[in-house]
Amino acid sequence: MAAKLKKGDRVVVLAGKDKGKQGEITAVMPKDNKAVVEGVNVAIRHTKQTPTAQGGRLAKAMPIDLSNLALLDANGKATRVGFRFEGEKKVRYAKTTGDVI
């Protein structure tokens, strides 16, 4: 099955503690049905100091389920993603506007 959301897409969170937040997808895990979104679902990682690296509390974006994300169209509104053929090529398009993504 083709991926509706890909790395680099601008998305909005639909549910959970980060509902309404927007960000860019930095990684997608299709087998787990999850994605990592910049600045969303952030956890604090405590690291021990080493001779080469300073320790402390580092913020790390954790994976979020794809069902809780929606793509942002050109107008900045949440949209569903569809597929269609343009010539010989299969393309993704925003269902709200019909524009090719």
Swiss-Prot record:
What NCBIfam families does the record tag this protein with? rplX_bact
Keyword Protein biosynthesis included in the entry's annotation:
no
InterPro entries registered for this protein in UniProt: KOW, Rib_uL2_dom2, Ribosomal_uL24, Ribosomal_uL24_CS, Ribosomal_uL24_KOW, Translation_prot_SH3-like_sf
The record's annotation in SUPFAM superfamilies points to: Translation proteins SH3-like domain
Q: GO CC: one term?
A: ribonucleoprotein complex
State the organism of origin: Cereibacter sphaeroides (strain ATCC 17023 / DSM 158 / JCM 6121 / CCUG 31486 / LMG 2827 / NBRC 12203 / NCIMB 8253 / ATH 2.4.1.) (Rhodobacter sphaeroides)
Gene coding for it: rplX
Which protein is depicted? Large ribosomal subunit protein uL24
On assembly, the entry states: Part of the 50S ribosomal subunit.
What this protein is reported to do is described as:
One of two assembly initiator proteins, it binds directly to the 5'-end of the 23S rRNA, where it nucleates assembly of the 50S subunit.
Gene Ontology MF: a single term: rRNA binding
Query: What are the alphabetically sorted keywords of the record?
Result: Ribonucleoprotein, Ribosomal protein, RNA-binding, rRNA-binding
